[in-house]
Swiss-Prot record:
Protein family according to the UniProt entry: Belongs to the RutC family.
Gene: rutC
Pfam families in the record: Ribonuc_L-PSP (PF01042)
Catalytic activity entry: (Z)-3-aminoacrylate + H2O + H(+) = 3-oxopropanoate + NH4(+)
The protein's Enzyme Commission number: 3.5.-.-
Provenance organism: Rhizobium rhizogenes (strain K84 / ATCC BAA-868) (Agrobacterium radiobacter)
Protein name: 3-aminoacrylate deaminase RutC
Amino acid sequence: MPKSIIVPAGTHKPIAPFSPGTLADGIVYVSGTLPFDKNNDVVHVGDAGAQTRHVLETIKSVIETAGGTMEDVTMNHIFVTDWANYQAVNAVYAEYFPGDKPARYCILCGLVKPDALVEIATVAHIGKK
């Protein structure tokens, strides 16, 4: 099964050995996405809603670069550092998935940088385009 590496224009260089996304058999796998700028610094420190929006916009750019849309998302893996931010994360998340909701789970955990409040990894089925 051949795969394609998906790297949207302007994407920051990952801080570890991974690609922002891969496409194989019409499925886009988006790596865990953190609220980082192009220098791998955390953006919107202390604002879980703004960090969630930044993360989802980054995920959207990976999926669109692969030829899909957010409507193609079938699964999200969400990681948060504090349950107090859960409502803010969900409020922004709902804006990106207004219709049929993809499957998901949410885990409370520490993240790679202390100021990062949310990380999301995504799977989207875009078909053979």
